[in-house]
Amino acid sequence: MKASMFLALAGLVLLFVVGYASESEEKEFPRELLSKIFAVDDFKGEERGCKGFGDSCTPGKNECCPNYACSSKHKWCKVLLGK
């Protein structure tokens, strides 16, 4: 009974997300959603002088903010995991 309720709730959440995505006219919905999920004080983008999550960067130039690293494969700032 608990599992079926959980699955029903998960299905409703998924339906809500898909419905919101289909109504969104912006083509950058996945990036917008990820930036809202992983937002870490992105309100001061120009003031801080570094690039936040998802911003394009050049590998080896240390342009990303602390706790972010420039991905050499995708060439955008991502969350730094580990040391």
UniProtKB/Swiss-Prot annotation:
PROSITE patterns: HWTX_1
Residues bearing the modification Leucine amide: L81
Signal sequence segment: 1-21
Tissue: Expressed by the venom gland.
GO molecular function, one term: ion channel inhibitor activity
Biological role stated in the UniProt entry: Lethal neurotoxin. Selectively blocks tetrodotoxin-sensitive voltage-gated sodium channels (Nav). Does not affect tetrodotoxin-resistant voltage-gated sodium channels or calcium channels.
Subunit structure: Monomer.
Comment on protein domains: The presence of a 'disulfide through disulfide knot' structurally defines this protein as a knottin.
UniProt-recorded name of the protein: Mu-theraphotoxin-Hhn2d
Source organism: Cyriopagopus hainanus (Chinese bird spider)
Phylogenetic placement of the source organism: Eukaryota, Metazoa, Ecdysozoa, Arthropoda, Chelicerata
